[in-house]
Amino acid sequence: QFFDLEYANFNNPNFNTNKQFAFLRKDSDSLFLIVTNFEDSDVNIGLNIPSHAFEYLGLSDGEFKEYTELLSGKKNKGILSSANQFEICVPKNEGVIVKFKL
């Protein structure tokens, strides 16, 4: 399953839809958040994930989850919630792939 996050972030001061792109992908046991940054500087992104994304993907809104950044191997924890932005740093002209185990 695929869910585009651009429309939920057009008026978001913590996400530049002209320079960043984000979407969710889900399979049977994992959720992936993919964020790309086409800016010439690192950015700290605050990403809105709308409640409709949780409904569409069959996920619980507001769960505290461990995740792995697949390109760096870093592990972290965060809350996937429509009430709070998901915050992550994305290097210049690169992307991050975040994997949550379901």
Question: Predicted regions span which residues?
Answer:
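C-terminal beta-strand-rich structural cap/linker in extracellular carbohydrate-active enzymes
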Residues: 78-102
